[in-house]
Structure formats: C-alpha cells, structure tokens
A protein has these predicted regions:
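Periplasmic alpha-helical coiled-coil/stalk elements that build and connect Gram-negative outer-membrane
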Residues: 25, 29, 144-259, 359, ...
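Acidic, low-complexity, intrinsically disordered peripheral segments
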Residues: 20, 25-27, 62, 74-84, ...
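Flexible, solvent-exposed loop segments that connect beta-strands
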Residues: 80-103
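Amphipathic alpha-helical coiled-coil segments
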Residues: 43-58, 147, 151-170, 224, ...
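Sec-dependent N-terminal signal peptides
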Residues: 4-13
Length: 431
C-alpha cells in the first residue's frame, strides 16, 4: 500500500513539473533557448578558454626554462688507395692516397648534447602577452554580446508575430459567436415571417467566410510558431499557447556609453597592443644556457669525452631599415579609421532612436483614432442589433457595419503589434 501511494505521489509530482515546463513558454524561455543552441555563441564563449590556454603557453615560453636534447652523427666516406688497392671506407680516420673530402678539414664526428635554457629578460614580453590575451578575452566576450543582442531582437520579433496571429484567432472566434447569436435571432424572425430567407443565407455566408479566416489565422500561427522554434533550436512541432507580451521601453541611462561602441574601443586597444608586441623585437634578449653530453671525432676512447659547458646568449636589434617607424604610421592610420567608423555608427544609432520615438508617437495617435472608430461601430451595432430583433433593419446593413468594425479591429491589432516591434527596435538600438 505504501509503495502504491509513493508511486502515485511521484507521478503527480512528475506531471506537475512537466506541465509547469510546458506552460513556462515566456519570451525569456525562447531567448535563453536560442542563446543555448547557437553554435556561434558557443564558439565565442570557447574563445575565452582558448585565450586562457594561450596565455599559459606564452608564460611558459617567456619565463620558464626549456630542456632540449640534440644530436648528430657525421660520416665522411672516402675511397682509399693505400697499400696499392682501392677500398671504400664509410668513415675513414686516416688515409694518405684517397678520393674524398680532405680529412684534415673534415672528419666524422658524433655529438649528443642536453641543453637547458632559461630566459632572463622575458618578464616584459610576458606582460605584453598577458595584456593581449586579456584583450582577446574581452573581445570574445564582446562578440558574444554582439551576437546575443540581435538574436534577442529576432526572437522577440518572431514571438510578436505569433502573438498577432493568436490575437487574430481570438478575435475571429468572438466574431463567430456574434454571427451565431444573430443567426439564431434571424432564424426566429424568418420562422415568424418577419424576415427573409435570404437574410439567413447572408449570415450563413458570413459565418463560412469567418471560419475560413479562422483556419487561415491558425495556419499562420502554426507556421510562425515553427519558425520561432527553428530560430531557437527547439525540436517541437506541436502548437502551444504563448503568453501575452507587453514590451517595456528601456530608456537610456545618462553618462553611460552605448555597448555598440565597445567594439571600437576594443579594436583601438588591439592596435595599440599589437604595436607593443611588434616593438618587443627591439628589446634586448638575454638567455642563460647549460649543456652537457658527448662530443667526439675519434671513437677510440669516446667514454673520456663526456663534458658540459655554460654561457649566455645575447641579441639586440640596432637598425631594421625604419620598419618600426612605418609600423607606427600604420597604427596611426588604423586608429583614424576606427574613429571614423565609430562616429558613423553612433550617428546612425542616434538617428534610429529618434526614428523609433517618432513612430511611437504616431502609433499612439493612430490607436486613439481607431479606438474612437471602434466605439462608434459598437454603438451602431448595438442599435442595429435591437432593430434587427424587431425586423426594422436589414441583415445586409448589419453585416456591412460588422465587416467595417472587424476590419478596424484587425487594423488596431496590427497597429499594436507594429508598435511593439518599434519598441523592440528602440530597445535594440538604445543598448
């Protein structure tokens, strides 16, 4: 009995969480799904880990010691004629009459050396590399934000299209209820001889037309919902009920720069750091080395020729044909190009914001006008409904006014959706 109760309780809990997951289909759910399933965003996030690994590699190269094993075995073959007969020798140590390299200048040898090298002036280079790696990480994070931001806008716009279809479906359903109610009234009038059969037929035609619109809106909702799932990487083909969305206007924060200009700041820093990295070759380089091993020319008594040595290697570029000067000029020209791009981007962004605010003001005016028209249509339809009940107005007149009201209602639904799209655009640019 206890096992049965436990099984039943677990099923109830599972159904609760399943239903909760299916009902939590807000815009936030779709945006987060789109971010999680975007391969480009995942790639940008991996770049941060790649830069950290690269920084550790550079740290090892500039500051840590290095141990290397090197070796070579040199053969000097000759054709010897000593003793009156020719003989091929792979690695002659001595000969008088022979063909081949002069053995006094070149002879066989065997070298095997283990070398330990420690950079002594690598901290400056590592600091520059550390700054470059940090900047690359910041650039990867900024690219992630720059990819997420338009993705949020695309998901929001697609979500609003689905809500428009849903609103059209709901309104068409309400129109069907009105037509059914009037059909019931007119049918009684026809039965009592106060109305004509043609009036009832007109209402039947209007009902069929409205059902066709309802089917079209449901199909549009399914199509737009599948596009939304495709955009977000959601493997689901079932229709779900999306909650209503009212986008808030995100007003600008004073003295806070736009994140759109962040990429130009990072590009400018990247040029400066690249120039510093280039100038590292003009810094002096000093390395300490210690090696030990075997070096022999004559293999007889080779075991006595193990040894070791130590020293310093130094290098410093004094003159490079004015390459450094030309590199600095390139950096100045690149900085100028970045400033030009930044100013143009900021100009376009400000114009987009002003355009959105102007459109929002006009949409508010148009919505007030449409609301007044709808209120007038509702008054007329209310009066026509009373007169239709007693047969004082024709069904054709009633249907004509009803169609005008339906079209005005749809115009208002479209206007509200367009207004939400403008708010989404404003929030996108005001970032």
């Amino acid at each position: 009995m206890n096992r049965l109760l436990l099984f039943f309780s677990l099923n109830i809990i599972g159904l609760h969480f399943y239903g909760q997951g299916k009902n939590d289909l807000s815009i936030h759910y779709y945006i987060e799904a789109a971010k999680a399933n975007s391969p480009l965003i995942a790639d940008f996030r991996n770049q941060s880990e790649i830069e950290q690994a690269e920084l550790e590699r550079l740290k090892a190269m500039y500051t840590h010691s290095r141990l290397e094993l090197n070796g070579d075995y040199l053969f000097v073959p000759v054709v010897s004629k000593d003793g009156g007969h020719a003989e091929f020798k792979w690695n002659a140590r001595s000969a008088t009459d022979y063909y081949g390299y002069d053995l006094g200048e070149s002879s066989g040898s065997f070298h095997t050396v283990l070398t330990w090298t420690q950079p002594l002036l690598g901290k400056t280079s590592y600091k520059v590399a550390q700054g470059q790696a940090k900047l690359n990480t910041d650039m990867a994070r900024n690219r992630t934000r720059m990819e997420e931001h338009p993705l949020e806008r695309s998901v929001t716009e697609q979500y609003l299209l689905c809500l428009l279809d849903k609103a059209q479906i709901d309104y068409t359903d309400s129109v069907s209820a009105v037509i059914e109610r009037q059909t019931h009234i007119v049918r009684k009038l026809v039965e009592n001889g106060f109305s004509k059969q043609s009036d009832l037929n007109l209402l039947a035609i209007e009902r069929e037309a409205n059902m066709e619109l309802l089917t079209a809106f449901r199909q549009a909702y399914h199509t737009h919902l599948m596009d939304l799932n495709l955009l977000c990487g959601i493997a689901d083909t079932t229709d779900v009920d999306l909650p209503v969305l009212q986008l808030p206007i995100r007003w600008p924060v004073n003295d806070k720069p736009s994140l759109f200009t962040e990429q130009y700041r990072l590009d400018s820093l990247n040029i400066s750091l690249s120039l510093r990295s280039f100038n590292l070759q003009y810094k002096p380089k000093l390395d300490l080395f210690v090696n030990g091993g075997l070096q022999v020319g004559d293999f007889a008594g080779w075991y006595r020729h193990f040894g070791w040595s130590a020293g310093l290697t130094f290098s410093w570029t004094i003159f490079d044909g004015k390459q450094k000067r030309w590199k600095e000029r390139q950096a100045l020209w690149q900085q100028g190009s970045i400033r030009t791009y930044k100013e143009n981007s900021e100009y376009q962004r400000n114009m987009r914001i002003k355009q959105c605010l102007s459109e929002l003001h006009r949409y508010d005016q148009r919505e007030r006008t449409l609301e007044n028209q709808i209120a007038e249509y509702e008054t007329i339809l209310s009066d026509y409904g009373k007169e239709l009940n007693i047969g004082q107005v024709s069904v054709l007149d009633y249907i004509t006014v009803l169609r005008n009201k339906i079209q005005t209602e749809r115009d208002r639904l479209l206007l509200r959706t367009n207004r939400q799209l403008v708010i989404a655009a404003y929030n996108y640019w005001n970032w």
